[in-house]
C-alpha cells in the first residue's frame, strides 16, 4: 500500500512563498441564521445567550403545524429551549428561505417534555431537501436526557425544507428547537485523502455529499461549550475514547495566542479553546518511545466517514523538531508529518481530512505516533482535536436504507403492506445491482467523488490557496 510522505523543500517551497503570515481577524456572520424555539409563542434566550424565536403563527411552519407543548415546572438549570416543543401527527414541514446558497449547518434538538404525553408513540422520520436525516428509533433511548443532531447540508436552491413524518397515522413526531445556519466557505473542503487497506489516494467531490456529526472531541482539554465556539458547537473531552496509557503520554496547555493564518484553519474550523490543548508523546531519555496514542469511536456500520484531525504544535520549543505518523483505522495516513513545514510557524493550526469506511465491527480508530524521523528528548506526536462525520449513503440517507421519497410515499398510501412489499423488492433489486457493479469495478470508482492523480502536498497547497483566494 502506498504511504503518504511529505518531502521537504520541493513540494512546499511555492506554498510557503504564498502563505500569508497575517492573522485572520474577520468575525464570521452567517447570512442565513435561523434559531427556532418550537412550540413557543415568543422569543427565548438559551444558556449560551442566543435568542431563539418562537414558531407559533410563524410563516416558516406549514399549515399542518401540529400542536405546541410546554412544561409548567421545568428542571432547574435546563435550557429554556427545552421547556417547549411541537408535536406532529401528520407530515409537517418548516420552510426556510435561503439567501446564501451552499453548505448549511442544521441542528435538531430533542428532549422529552414532562407533559403526560406517551413518548412510546413518538416514531418518525426527519427529511431535508431529499436527505433522510433521522429515523427516531436511533435516538429514542437517549432523548430523555436531550439529543442534538447536527448536519451539514448543501442547499443550492432558495429553500430548505425540513419535514417531520410520523411512521404511521397512530404515531407522532416532535421537536424542541431547530437551527439553520449558513456555513463558512472553508468549513468543508472538496478534497480529502481516501485511506483503506488497499489505497491511500486523493479524492475530490466531497462537497457533493451531506454530513452528520457523530463525534467531536477536544483532545486533552475540557468540554468546549457553544458559547466559546464561533459556530456554536460543542467539543467533548476525549477521555472516554482514549485507549492508550503510557508514561510517555501527557497533556499540554498553551497559554499564548493561537496563530490563525489566512489560508489555514480558521476559528470557524476550530476554536482557540480546542487548539490550545493537546495530548503528546514525548521522549525524556535517549530513546524514542515505541508507542502510539490511539482513540476508538463507535460508529454505524455501512457508511463512509469523514475524519478530520486537528493539529497545532503548541509543545515544541522550535520549528522542525516534531515529526510523527498519523494512522486511521490502523492504516498509514501521513508519514513523517512536520506541522511547521506546512504552517511556517509554531502554534498555528492545521487540519487534515480523511475518508474511511467504518472500520471493524462499527469502531473507527485514529492514532498518532513517532516516525523514523522523530528526535529524542523532543515531542514525538501531537493531536488537538478530532471530528468524525457520517457521509450519506447512496440513497441520501444518514439513518438506514429508506430514502426520503419512500418515506413520503409510504405515508401517502396509508402505510399499506403492498407498498412496504414493493419498497422491500426495490431495495433488494438495488442491493443486487450494487453488488454486481461492485464486483466489476474498483472500490474507489463506487464512491460519488473522483480520484485525483496528485501528491498530497500539492493538494494541501491547492486547498490553502483556494481558501486564501476566497477570503480576499
Predicted feature descriptions by range:
Residues 2-472:
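Compositionally biased, intrinsically disordered or flexible polar/acidic segments
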Amino acid at each position: 500500500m502506498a504511504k503518504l510522505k511529505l518531502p521537504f523543500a520541493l513540494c512546499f517551497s511555492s506554498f510557503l512563498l504564498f502563505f500569508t503570515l497575517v492573522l485572520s481577524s474577520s468575525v464570521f456572520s452567517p447570512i442565513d441564521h435561523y434559531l427556532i424555539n418550537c412550540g413557543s409563542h415568543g422569543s427565548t434566550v438559551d444558556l449560551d445567550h442566543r435568542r431563539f424565536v418562537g414558531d407559533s403563527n410563524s410563516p416558516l411552519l406549514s399549515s399542518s403545524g401540529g400542536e405546541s407543548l410546554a412544561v409548567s415546572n421545568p428542571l432547574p438549570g435546563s435550557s429554556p429551549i427545552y421547556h417547549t416543543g411541537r408535536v406532529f401527527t401528520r407530515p409537517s414541514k418548516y420552510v426556510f428561505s435561503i439567501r446564501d446558497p451552499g453548505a448549511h449547518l442544521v441542528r435538531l434538538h430533542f428532549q422529552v417534555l414532562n407533559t403526560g404525553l406517551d413518548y412510546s408513540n413518538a416514531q418518525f422520520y426527519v427529511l431535508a431537501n431529499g436527505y433522510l436525516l433521522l429515523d427516531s428509533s436511533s435516538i429514542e433511548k437517549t432523548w430523555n436526557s436531550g439529543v442534538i443532531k447536527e448536519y451539514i447540508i448543501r442547499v443550492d436552491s432558495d429553500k430548505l425544507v425540513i419535514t417531520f413524518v410520523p411512521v404511521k397515522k397512530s404515531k407522532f413526531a416532535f421537536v424542541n428547537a431547530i437551527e439553520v445556519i449558513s456555513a463558512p466557505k472553508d468549513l468543508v473542503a472538496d478534497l480529502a485523502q481516501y485511506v483503506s487497506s488497499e489505497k491511500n489516494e486523493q479524492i475530490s467531490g466531497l462537497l457533493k455529499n451531506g454530513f452528520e456529526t457523530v463525534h467531536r472531541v477536544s483532545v486533552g482539554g475540557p468540554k468546549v461549550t457553544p458559547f466559546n465556539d464561533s459556530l456554536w458547537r460543542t467539543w467533548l473531552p476525549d477521555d472516554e475514547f482514549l485507549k492508550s496509557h503510557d508514561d510517555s503520554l501527557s497533556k499540554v496547555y498553551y497559554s499564548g495566542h493561537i496563530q490563525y493564518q489566512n489560508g489555514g484553519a480558521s476559528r470557524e474550523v476550530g476554536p482557540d479553546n480546542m487548539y490550545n490543548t493537546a495530548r503528546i508523546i514525548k521522549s525524556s531519555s535517549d530513546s524514542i518511545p515505541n508507542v502510539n496514542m490511539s482513540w476508538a469511536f463507535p460508529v454505524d456500520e455501512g457508511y463512509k466517514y469523514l475524519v478530520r484531525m486537528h493539529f497545532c504544535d503548541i509543545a515544541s520549543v522550535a520549528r522542525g523538531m516534531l515529526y510523527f505518523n498519523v494512522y486511521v483505522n490502523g492504516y498509514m495516513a501521513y508519514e513523517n508529518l512536520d506541522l511547521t513545514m506546512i504552517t511556517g510557524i509554531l502554534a498555528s493550526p492545521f487540519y487534515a481530512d480523511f475518508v474511511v469506511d467504518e472500520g471493524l465491527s462499527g469502531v473507527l480508530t485514529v492514532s498518532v505516533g513517532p516516525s523514523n524521523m522523530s528526535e529524542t528528548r523532543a515531542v514525538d506526536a501531537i493531536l488537538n482535536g478530532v471530528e468524525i462525520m457520517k457521509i450519506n449513503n447512496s440513497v441520501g440517507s444518514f439513518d438506514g436504507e429508506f430514502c426520503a421519497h419512500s418515506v413520503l410515499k409510504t405515508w401517502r398510501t396509508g402505510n399499506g403492506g403492498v407498498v412496504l412489499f414493493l419498497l422491500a423488492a426495490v431495495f433488494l433489486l438495488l442491493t443486487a445491482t450494487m453488488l454486481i457493479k461492485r464486483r466489476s469495478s474498483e472500490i474507489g470508482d463506487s464512491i460519488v467523488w473522483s480520484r485525483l492523480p496528485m501528491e498530497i502536498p500539492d493538494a494541501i497547497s491547492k486547498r490553502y490557496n483556494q481558501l486564501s483566494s476566497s477570503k480576499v
